[in-house]
């Protein structure tokens, strides 16, 4: 069986490394991207089962990227993450259809639970 692919978009390399290590240790295939533009230019969008997406990115914001992805034929479940948490941002993430919204630094169990929820495992 092919491992489910999780995409992670964040402009913080330490977050990308930590999430890749964690999810890789659980058997997921993990693709990391330093920007929304990098994700859009990649050839693996159709293979991503879930996207962990930073709200505040250089270039396209997480919300702008989510808007573009919402026009695609296949919808990817999104988990928004952010270090700049506030009620309007949380509300916007929920309105955008986020599976989950996590504040950095987030607990690894919270991320795993959110991914399981996004993949329909719970």
Language-model features, listed with the residues they occupy:
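Acidic, metal-coordinating helix/loop segments flanking the phosphotransfer/catalytic sites
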Residues: 32-50
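Acidic catalytic/metal-coordinating carboxylates
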Residues: 34-35, 61-64
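Active-site residues of response regulator receiver
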Residues: 54, 82
């Amino acid at each position: 069986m092919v491992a489910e692919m999780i995409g992670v978009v964040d402009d913080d390399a330490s977050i990308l490394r930590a999430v890749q290590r964690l999810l890789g240790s659980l058997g997921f295939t993990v693709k990391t991207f330093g920007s929304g533009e990098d994700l859009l230019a990649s050839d693996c969008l159709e293979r991503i089962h879930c996207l962990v997406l930073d709200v505040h990115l250089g270039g396209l914001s997480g919300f702008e990227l989510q808007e573009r992805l919402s026009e695609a034929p296949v919808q990817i479940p999104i988990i928004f993450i952010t270090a700049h948490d506030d009620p309007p941002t949380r509300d916007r993430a929920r309105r955008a259809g986020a599976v989950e919204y996590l504040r950095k630094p987030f607990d690894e169990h919270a991320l795993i639970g959110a991914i399981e929820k996004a993949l329909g495992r719970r």
